[in-house]
A protein has these predicted regions:
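Divalent-cation-assisted or electrostatically stabilized phosphate/pyrophosphate-binding catalytic cores
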Residues: 189-193, 229, 299-324, 414-444, ...
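GAF sensory/regulatory domain recognition
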Residues: 63-112, 135-136, 174, 284, ...
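Helix-loop-beta substructure at the N-terminus of cytosolic sensory domains
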Residues: 30, 38-92, 111-117, 240-241, ...
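Regulatory sensory and allosteric helical modules in signal-transduction proteins
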Residues: 86-156, 400-401, 419-420, 426-427, ...
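Regulatory loop-to-helix N-cap segments in sensory/regulatory domains
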Residues: 2-18, 140-141, 149, 153-154, ...
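Signal-transmission linkers at sensory-effector interfaces
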Residues: 1-48, 55-56, 214-228, 410-413
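A short, aliphatic-rich beta-strand micro-motif
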Residues: 156-172
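Signal-transmission/dimerization alpha-helices at domain junctions
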Residues: 12, 123-127, 173-174, 196-218, ...
Length: 569
């Protein structure tokens, strides 16, 4: 079986190339190489490779195959197809899918698929230059002939070039069809110069494609490491398991809305794809410092919770008090009935008094017990009189422990926790929680960020700052913060307000959340211009439709939102 692995016709059907033409095409090749190295999108890069190869060899048509793995073994996937004279353009930026099955490099019997010219080039790492497919006996061109029969085309000359990466591994195949004579417009074979130019281009293209694939793989690996960190954080706390995913989503929604703004103070804010990627990475890493936060603080669902809920200790103490009261009452009754001189009527009255006092004491105990259980649940606000009652209960009862010693019913630490005015965290615990942003900044600033990601620490580290400088940890003002950091601040707050997985509160409705956020604008907490865009562009609604429960999405009267400026300033 004949194998055409070099040019079978170097000049047949084509005029001899002039030296000037060859130099022109070499210059074109150099320009193409430079252009390919600058392309950032893999799909666009594949398209540029084929279009450039067609131009430099004057091919009417061509296909670019990409080698990929499958359950049946390696195969060549149709990535880009072009045939100028038929107006065919599929794959790439066309949005038109290529309706052809991939070419497997081996058959079902495991033998090499040397019948298909593209597979043969990939398997042998050899260029195949065929002058006339209709007279070629070495390969199976039945599919090509069927295509020609349907379209009236004649696929005559084929130039098939393997593409190798820096490790000499085949990554794809470039196939060109029908070289067009610039003088006559007729189709003919590819010359030896065409082949050398195509091979040179394929080599440059393979390097550019490999670089792009390596960059894409590294970016995917980098994101996977970030996802790994976020998974660890989510596993620590099922109460905030979605926070690390939702904040980046809302951050990008608001950033895009600002990017689309053509008037107002933020009209000059523009994001490139690089800027978007940088902000996305910052959003994904904004809480990475939470890996250092103790889980019993992160998950503190009640005020008395440490590694367990200490309310059960209080229940035990109440049972001890109840037992002591009942024992004391029984002892009084026994002492009473043991007095022989006591008249029956008087004894009955005194026994009734003992029983009545016991019932009243037990009712008071049960009332105080339920009261403390109620206080143990974190709420929006605990009034001073409620806090005072906790303190009275704490020191008003004395209980006897197993060693026989007596102590106040509540320890000072328990009183401190039960009188937390808002939520479930003490000041010290809140400082521990807040320390996660310090840890985040330290962790991110320790990394050797490339130039296109150098702002990640600033973006991620500023979402707890306030516009008036009263935030933490650096007490930055609005003027000291980037727009991106301020965007993330709003996203972080709104997500927390609407989150339905917090242990001490329900997820708020849109109206409630926007009212709180509006007051935060007036109070100098969040950026006023970003807040107005957040409402005006209905970013809150897009987020709600994706992440909130239906009962949280109520009707919004934007005119009643505190501080909202309906029209751009």
């Amino acid at each position: 079986m004949a194998r055409s692995t070099t040019a079978t016709a170097q000049t047949g059907g084509l005029s001899l190339e002039t030296v000037e033409d060859l130099f022109r095409r070499l210059e074109q090749l150099n320009e193409i190489g430079a252009a390919l190295s600058q392309e950032k999108d893999t799909g666009h890069l594949l398209e540029k490779i084929l279009v450039a190869a067609k131009a430099i060899t004057r091919a009417d048509g061509g296909t670019l195959y990409v080698l990929e793995s499958s359950d049946e073994g390696p195969r060549l996937r149709f990535a880009i197809m072009r045939t100028d004279s038929l107006g065919i353009a599929m794959g790439g930026t066309t949005g038109s899918d290529i309706p052809y099955y991939p070419i497997h490099l081996s058959g079902k019997d495991g033998k090499p698929n040397n019948q298909m010219v593209a597979a043969y080039a990939a398997l042998t790492d050899k260029t195949v230059n065929i002058a006339d497919a209709y007279s070629e006996e070495g390969f199976d061109f039945s599919g090509t002939r069927n295509f020609d029969k349907k379209t009236g085309y004649r696929s005559k000359a084929f130039l098939t070039v393997p593409m190798k990466n820096h490790m000499s591994e085949i990554i794809g195949v470039l196939q060109l069809i029908n070289s067009k004579d610039p003088a006559t417009g007729e189709f003919g074979p590819f010359s030896h110069s065409d082949q050398r130019l195509a091979e040179s281009l394929a080599s440059q293209a393979a390097i550019a494609l490999t670089n792009r694939q390596l960059i894409d793989q590294l970016e995917r690996l980098f994101k996977s490491f970030i996802a790994l960190i976020n998974t660890a954080i989510d596993e620590k706390s099922h109460y905030t398991s979605g926070h690390c995913k939702r904040v980046p989503e809302l951050t990008m929604m608001l950033a895009e809305a600002v990017n689309e703004t053509s008037d107002g103070p933020l009209r000059n804010f523009n994001m490139s794809d690089k800027d978007r990627y940088e902000l996305e990475i910052a959003g994904l890493l904004h809480d990475c410092g939470k890996v250092t936060t103790p889980v019993h603080v992160v998950d503190k669902a009640t005020k008395l919770q440490t590694i367990f809920d200490r309310i059960n200790l209080l229940d035990t103490r109440f049972e001890v008090l109840k037992r002591d009261l009942e024992i004391a009452a029984l002892e009084q009754k026994i002492d009473l009935v043991s007095q022989p001189s006591l008249e029956k009527v008087d004894a009955r009255d005194r026994l009734g008094q003992i029983e009545q006092k016991l019932r009243e004491s037990l009712r008071r105990l049960e009332s105080d017990r339920e009261f403390l259980r109620h206080c143990n649940v974190g709420r929006e606000f605990m009034p001073p009189e409620t806090q005072e009652r906790v303190k009275q209960i704490g020191t008003g009862y004395q209980w006897t422990d197993i060693s026989g010693g007596t102590a106040d019913f509540l320890t000072q630490d328990e009183i401190k926790n039960l009188t937390i005015s808002k939520g479930t965290l003490t000041h010290e615990e809140r400082e521990t929680i807040n320390h996660h942003i310090v840890a985040t900044i330290k962790m991110l600033e320790a990394l050797p960020w490339p130039k296109h990601l150098e702002n990640v620490p600033e973006y991620a580290g500023g979402h707890h700052e306030r516009m008036d400088g009263k935030g933490y940890p650096k007490h930055l003002t609005r003027e000291q913060m980037s727009v991106q950091a301020r965007v993330m601040g709003i996203a972080d707050i709104f997500e927390a307000l609407t989150a339905k997985d917090r242990p001490y509160k329900r997820g708020k409705t849109l109206t409630e959340s926007l009212n709180i956020l509006g007051h935060m604008k007036l109070d100098g907490h969040v950026d006023p211009d970003l807040f107005d865009i957040f409402v005006r562009k209905k970013v809150y609604l897009r987020y709600a439709e994706q992440f909130l429960d239906p009962d949280q999405i109520d009707e919004i009267d934007e005119s009643k939102i505190p501080g909202f400026a309906a029209d751009p300033a």
